[in-house]
């Protein structure tokens, strides 16, 4: 049973003689005939399955394997080994592309687009991306829009399983998206691109040697928050809050980086969350002089550390996190599989729900309204909730008691980069805006109904001819007064009163 995976891996890399010596079974050749006229020959191991055959065809034809249907003697191949299905060397298979239409293909498109993009990657592309040798470019389809994403991890140091993520830029027109899901929670439209600028990285790392990676353009991105610290981890290259201690302790299977040189690490009284003032990724358990935050294990996942809106639809940022244990091998290294890439993408999409950064203009407006309101105290910045960190590291390390008293508006503007609005406050603001829109729409609808009623009543026939002109004059005056948008317009409807007056006058006559 151990010979089959080796035979498959060898044949996929092109070392056919070594495969025959290991497996002892010669590969079989299959003739693939497509209904569109394409014919080619495919060599694969004798123990190959239908799923593996579809994967090979998908990589060769650049077509998602879900859209491939294979027929052998008028029998559709769905699962199982090829030998068990009567397929031998020289067999002829018919390839029928699957065509989907209507709403059925729309339902599962977002999930399938990611898997289709990942399954079309070769083993070399996956290995080069996870080792940091080359970037990874994916073409994803979100709804009716195409999005091109390019990711790159730092070169993996010798002996260390750390993956260090670089810069994330997504281009496309998005309405209130969080990158990919402000971007996952909004819809990115048009073209999206994620590019990463490589940064210098130490080729070798010692457990007790401080390793600091400096960004090539530190001002391009806001400083980063804390980084999860269970191995292996993919961390950002943006600058952090505190520098590494002289001798950082070694965590199991991973080495931790800090991204900003010479910055004091002290807990901030304005931030109850330890992650906001001092990242534990650069503080060790043995050195307590600079940081008194206890080192604890963290859950797998990702955190978006910075998010910058460069232009409409063009976003950049950094995120970091730790891989799930299922994506690690026995030595703690990341598995060279598309499942690892899928886990990183899922962590990024999940992190967008916790990220609350927005373009500076919107944030500035919201904080100006919050700081000028009498209910919110201006001198102290609001506390940072879990998974949210300040956008500048140095001001948060200064105790709030030592800060001079400033004008509330000045303090508000200085706090824009120190804290992020809590989720409850954001939801309240959004709910208030939604209610205002609904009330405005209701008012407009009521106004239209009143106009229609006025026009309808003005054209209604009357049973008395002598005063018909007077009735029309009253209706015209009412229509002119309707433009003032009185809410008691119903009280001033003329028809019942006019009819009563008319009847009384008619009787008196």
UniProtKB/Swiss-Prot annotation:
Region Disordered, residue ranges: 1-27, 172-295, 370-404, 448-485
Cellular component terms (Gene Ontology): cytosol; nucleolus; nucleus
Ranges annotated as biased composition (Polar residues): 1-12, 286-295
Biased composition (Pro residues): 220-231, 376-386
Cysteines paired by S-S bonds: none
Superkingdom, natural source: Eukaryota
Pfam families: ubiquitin (PF00240)
Keyword Protein biosynthesis: no
Record-linked PANTHER family: MIDNOLIN
UniProt name for this protein: Midnolin
Organismal lineage: Eukaryota, Metazoa, Chordata, Craniata, Vertebrata
Gene: midn
